Amino acid sequence: MNKPTTISFHVPPKMWSEFQESMLKSRMFNEEVIGFFFCQRHQVSKRKIRYIPKTWVVPSPDCYEHQSATGLVLTQPFHSFLLENYLRVGLDVVHIHTHAGRGMPDFSYIDDRYESEYAQFISSGFPQKPRLISGVFDEDFQSCQFRMWDRKGRKFEKVQFCNSLFEVATNENDMNNPDLMFARQKIFGEANQRLLNELKVALIGCGGIGSIFAELLGRLGVKNWVLVDPDRLETLNLNRMPGATQEMVEQRWHKVHYVKHLIKRIYSEGSCVKTIPTSIESELARQEIATCDLIVVATDNHFSRKMAQEIALEYMRPLVCLGTHIDMKQDHTPRMYCRVSVPPMGGGWCLMCGNIISLQRAAFESAPAEIHQMVGSVGYIEGVNDPAVFWLNSICASTGVGVIHGMVSGFLNVDSGIDWVYEFPGSDWRKTNTEYLRSDDCFFCC
């Protein structure tokens, strides 16, 4: 018997908080209110479909022709505005409304009749045949039900609603069979450990930082990976990649296969590691990254980080960016930095508008080979690779894993994003005030 298709509607926490606040403010007394999300459909797998919100709208009181505790009707001009600006461009729509009272709400007979007719109307009125998802909440927005109608308005399917960072289904059977390996991590809660075990992580860049990161996050409990890196191991990598050997170099191992080897040493069974020995530009890499719950980029160039950020924005996935830098002052003393950045999921700022990566450098790196060689010395010493040491990479990777542990366990709030820079030998952590990174006109995230 075939498994049923799982349909989910996933809203980032910050976006949901803003939407919920706007809905509650739009209610004057105890009348019903309605809000709209306009979504992109993402076919994650054969049996999993995810609807990703691109924008939301909550009508103001003057947008209603009628509004009471028993129902509501939008004005025709406002409804036409929604149709022309969002459905005609190919987005699907989610209607969210409230019912009076507390506790699990039910769809009413009026809901059934209206939604059935509306699902048929929008699918027949637009070339892209948009789908209707509807959700009903109690008056406090604590309990809800969601469903998606077919295009004829005759049947509907249940939709799972998620407003957390990670949309991960955990195996309830694991509750009764805790893994002894993680006994020393019980303090963080068994539910959080199960979430780590089920989390699917895309790691872009399996070099000096990425390999250490994979070892650390793997030992924390992450077993499901997509590894992306086109490079092979070289002798100059051996000073900073744990477990890498000269024999691997001579056998021309791809870095993704080396990192898979690290993970499989931790989990001889029960892990799933997909290796993609290509650049992030490949369509295969892009498709696989989009299926992951978390994207981590640990590359040494700006172009791949820009690509990772674009994928994270398009598919509404949390992104963690890791990097280090070493240079020499005029008195020949070193300055060493590591940086951990997590842009807010759903917009606000990104790696580009936050100036965490350089679009100019990204353009240089994506240019034809002859131009790339000509400008490659900008910021580099020609003929010499970027300086890198194991211990600095380890600080960066360890902090990145700590941040992810906090995101999963809930003891670190990243709704507004974080940007942390560590400086050595001053041993100083500088935490950027992310309010200064916010942008209202970024080409990428606004």
Each model region followed by its residue ranges:
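Conserved beta-strand-loop surface patch within small alpha/beta domains used
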Residues: M1-V94, A100-A169
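Glycine-rich adenosine-cofactor-binding loop
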Residues: G189-R232
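Glycine-rich phosphate/adenylate-binding loop
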Residues: S124-G125, D138-R151, E167-E172, L195, ...
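A structured beta-alpha segment of the ubiquitous adenosine-cofactor-binding alpha/beta core
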Residues: V256-L294, T299-R305
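A short, basic/flexible loop-to-alpha-helix module at the beginning of a structural domain
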Residues: N171-V201
